[in-house]
Amino acid sequence: MADTEVEMQVSAADTNNNENGQAQSNYEYDVNVQDEEDEAAAGPMPLQMLEGNGITASDIKKIHEAGYYTVESIAYTPKRQLLLIKGISEAKADKLLGEASKLVPMGFTTATEYHIRRSELITITTGSKQLDTLLQGGVETGSITELFGEFRTGKSQICHTLAVTCQLPIDMGGGEGKCLYIDTEGTFRPVRLLAVADRYGLNGEEVLDNVAYARAYNADHQLELLQQAANMMSESRFSLLVVDSCTALYRTDFSGRGELSARQMHLARFMRTLQRLADEFGIAVVITNQVVAQVDGISFNPDPKKPIGGNILAHSSTTRLSLRKGRGEQRICKIYDSPCLPESEAIFAINSDGVGDPKEIIAPV
């Protein structure tokens, strides 16, 4: 009789353990599913989500071949651009825009909700604490940051450092994503990435594998590379796009006042595409810009150099940073234009392991 009672108690305990184990398993499954759903909701939506309600797989293939890879890209595109796609009628374009607008929020929201979204934005560390403080956390994702200055002011060095720090975990000031690097001047050096990777304890080979590099040879090619970039970003997680330099090829491909209008129109299209990528994929876009001397007949001009690109570039960039040389390896960064950052300066240094803080600040002579 006693043995029977013991067996019944053991059996009941086993049943409870099985139920608890099953409940734990179900809980872990639910958490994993929720994490996957949250991750999917946070990223861009694939075109396949538009299929149905009169939109066929053939239509999806047509717009994909035309260079549209996400639902967001359809929602942000004017109707007349969709009509240029072969095989897309006006009725079909209306259908595409209607279905995309249901999935992508494009209406009004309260300032409170927008403030909450802004507070959740990821910033990517520059490698310098002083520079990060100036930028209130680092380079902002979802917007365009422009670096301009004369030669040897640290523009390319900041880009090289960011190409590594964007791969860091978010709690270390990174973006947990790959980098896409467009080089127009032939100044990209992978050995600099290895030095920065070693500084942060990252595997050098993995860091280089996570940087997609392309050399642009003319202004048209530079714009075409953004089309390839959109395709790559739709397939993998990128957190940074670098264009170094954004304007170098425009200065040589378009010469004289006779081509000024064509140059500015082409540059405006390029900058608009950059902003679309930032909006669509939530990446940080960093561009470098050159400067030109001002010859205006004024005998005294405290700042004789200005960034090129005119009003097109000035209005397209969200944050503009002016860089100038300091003493030794020190460089000075000034907020030139920003919708939210105060006009102030910070001193950083170019070290053997990338951009960092100066060991001691040397006052200029």
Swiss-Prot record:
GO terms for cellular component: chromatin; chromosome, centromeric region; condensed nuclear chromosome; nuclear envelope; nucleus; site of double-strand break. GO terms for molecular function: ATP binding; ATP hydrolysis activity; ATP-dependent activity, acting on DNA; ATP-dependent DNA damage sensor activity; DNA strand exchange activity; double-stranded DNA binding; identical protein binding; single-stranded DNA binding. Residues 12-25 have a biased composition (Polar residues). It is found in: Nucleus. Transmembrane segments: none annotated. It comes from the Eukaryota. GO terms for biological process: chromosome organization involved in meiotic cell cycle; DNA recombinase assembly; DNA recombination; DNA strand invasion; double-strand break repair involved in meiotic recombination; double-strand break repair via homologous recombination; mating type switching; meiotic strand invasion. Coiled coil: none annotated. Pfam families: HHH_5, Rad51. Residues 1-25 are annotated as: Disordered. ATP binds at G149, E150, F151, R152, T153, G154, K155, S156. Keywords: ATP-binding, DNA damage, DNA recombination, DNA repair, DNA-binding, Magnesium, Nucleotide-binding, Nucleus. Belongs to the RecA family. RAD51 subfamily. Required both for recombination and for the repair of DNA damage caused by X-rays. Binds to single and double-stranded DNA, in the presence of magnesium, and exhibits DNA-dependent ATPase activity. Promotes DNA strand annealing and strand exchange via DNA recombinase activity and forms helical nucleoprotein filaments. NCBIfam families: PRK04301.1, recomb_RAD51. Interacts with rad22, rad54, rdh54, rhp54, rti1, swi2 and swi5. Forms homooiligomers. This is DNA repair protein rhp51.
